[in-house]
């Protein structure tokens, strides 16, 4: 074996080793309500290799009742803000992308008084503060628009009220906030609505087939964003 050939082999091996050593998976932190928890089961599969998904802990308690925001369920914007005020102080919280949704729990209404859980002005303020916390950490962010309901179906739930017009209004508020900060959005509202009236298994949650479609849609949006980011940095 001549000297040049040996050098080529060594260089090739070193390049492969360097590539392996420098390999760094893309870390996502996904925070959202029960809809996020349900499509989250398939999100990793559709993202494929090279992605790590991190979440708020507590799946076992969160799945006991999807209407009660505990454990890994992010809940309303007030709860998300409180959680992030603590989370940003964790040195290990430094994902490559933060994917967020909150809204379904914000628009809950007391069936007796009609009082909404989080008023519009407070929702806007909470989102602004959330953005500020994440941007101060220099973490890129994506916003997932809140999924809708069909009022006549949701009305069967007697624990609390929720109306699609409120979801649309709060989605518009979120659009204004995040567009002003150039935060990319994933329009899960429109995508899910397009799946038809049979998409629900209860008042607000979706069939396994629709959950898989949601996961694939979100994964595709994230991968496209990442490819665009890679292109810009080349």
Spans of model-derived segments:
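A generic structural signal for short, solvent-exposed coil/turn residues
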Residues: 12, 45-47, 177
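Alpha-helical cap/lid subdomain in secreted, periplasmic
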Residues: 78-233
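Conserved SGNH/GDSL esterase-like catalytic core that processes O-acyl groups on lipids
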Residues: 23-125
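Hydrophobic alpha-helical membrane context
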Residues: 15-18, 45, 199, 221
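Generic detector of low-complexity/intrinsically disordered segments
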Residues: 16-19, 49, 231
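Bacterial N-terminal signal peptides that target proteins for export
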Residues: 1-8
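Bacterial Sec-dependent signal peptides at the C-terminal "C-region" and cleavage site
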Residues: 8-25
